[in-house]
A protein has these predicted regions:
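Active-site and donor-binding regions of nucleotide-sugar-utilizing enzymes
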Residues: 2-189
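Conserved donor-binding/catalytic core segment of Leloir-type glycosyltransferases
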Residues: 29-34, 195-203
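Acidic/histidine-rich catalytic neighborhood
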Residues: 192
Length: 203
């Protein structure tokens, strides 16, 4: 089960375990970015909001983990994403208790997303994309794609083509934002009345 791209020392994190203490005092935003390329799409989120929130980053590859730790150090908490199995996901969520979850690009974990919906945890799909090849596969399972994506409070596509493909598979409203590696239009701000109500705002 442990692949070469994974960390053989920290592999227990893939089963929901952690050796860390949960930081106190600030609410936690969980950003999932599977690879280095996807992680770079979350750069501006980390740089703009680490002062006001605890930022938990999950990745699935050691290369992405090394990039996150090297470039951001104490600004973030890094963990490997748990495998998409209910028991391990619940263990992870019970410990970290995120107020907002941000999924970057295309690495959607169906079981995890359903667990977030059950817990009423706000989830956003940013820099969303779906390749023509994946789109052709999902067309045969569009009802399941609708079931997964109805969890998302908002979906922002990285291109007009991605927007059209995703719109045809989901009942959600999909907005075009552009590639987050090239833009910083998106702002995430706490509601003025309560820090637990997080608004998504487009500049």
């Amino acid at each position: 089960m442990i692949q070469k791209k994974e960390d053989t020392i920290r592999y227990k994190e893939r089963f929901g375990f952690t050796n860390l203490q949960k930081p106190l005092g600030k609410e936690l935003i969980w950003i999932h970015a599977s690879s280095v390329g996807e992680f770079k799409s979350s750069d501006f989120l980390i740089n703009n909001f680490f002062n006001n929130y605890n930022i938990l980053i999950t990745t699935t590859t050691k290369t992405a983990a090394d990039y996150a730790i090297t470039n951001y150090g104490d600004k973030i908490i890094h963990q490997y994403a748990p495998y998409d199995v209910t028991f391990w996901i619940n263990k992870f969520l019970d410990f970290w208790q995120p107020k907002l979850v941000i999924w970057i690009e295309s690495d959607l974990w169906p079981n995890t997303i359903v667990r977030l919906r059950e817990r009423k945890i706000t989830s956003v799909f940013l820099n969303a994309r779906i390749s023509p090849k994946s789109f052709n596969k999902w067309k045969y399972f569009s009802s399941y794609y609708k079931f997964i994506t109805k969890t998302f409070f908002a979906i922002y596509a990285q291109s007009q083509n991605d927007l059209k493909r995703i719109e045809s598979l989901t009942n959600n409203e999909v907005k075009y934002l552009g590639n987050l590696k090239l833009t910083n239009k998106l702002r995430i701000l706490p509601n003025s009345s309560t820090s637990t109500n997080i608004n998504i705002m487009i500049a």
